[in-house]
Amino acid sequence: MDVTTILGREPAMYIGGSWVGADETRPVINPADESVIATVPEADAGHAEQALEAARRAQRAWGRKSGPERGTVLKAVAAAVRANKEELARLVVAEQGKTITEARGEVGDAVPGFFAYYATFERAQVGAMFAPDEANEQLFVRSVPYGVVVGIIPWNYP
């Protein structure tokens, strides 16, 4: 999907595998010329609940995957970002007013680098041994995917 297609589509949120609209929208302003480059939906509490429930459903299957399987998915995301870096960089330029060089650095190096790093993170997090209270005990803690985390944060970037 190219930038023109992304910017020209009806405002919607991707929740649980489907595009979901909203009653309210807001413009995305190009800081370079103050033109409206897109319109985005304004999520409400109902959308947040939908997203949370979709994430809970997805997490059950995700939690059953092995660390290497989860890593394969994250590596694929990194590869997809790299493969589409020019289109993504153009979106960053239009939305944030960054130079194309800065935007390419983010989507060509930084973002895929984060995904690639976390793709191998599971191998480093194998667990921990602790000294037991009794001589005939062994205490081992194993990290596993536990559940869904919701974070709603103000995003004021750059």
For the regions a language model picked out, list residue spans one by one.
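Long amphipathic alpha-helix in the N-terminal Rossmann-like dinucleotide-binding domain
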Residues: 53, 75-86, 100-126
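Conserved small-residue-rich beta-alpha loop and adjacent elements
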Residues: 128-158
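Short glycine- and Lys/Arg-enriched binding-loop motifs that mark or flank ligand-binding interfaces
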Residues: 13, 93, 123, 143, ...
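Short, structured beta/alpha segment
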Residues: 1-94
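Short beta->alpha linker loops
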Residues: 43, 95, 106-110
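Short linear capping/connector segments at secondary-structure termini
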Residues: 91-99, 130-135
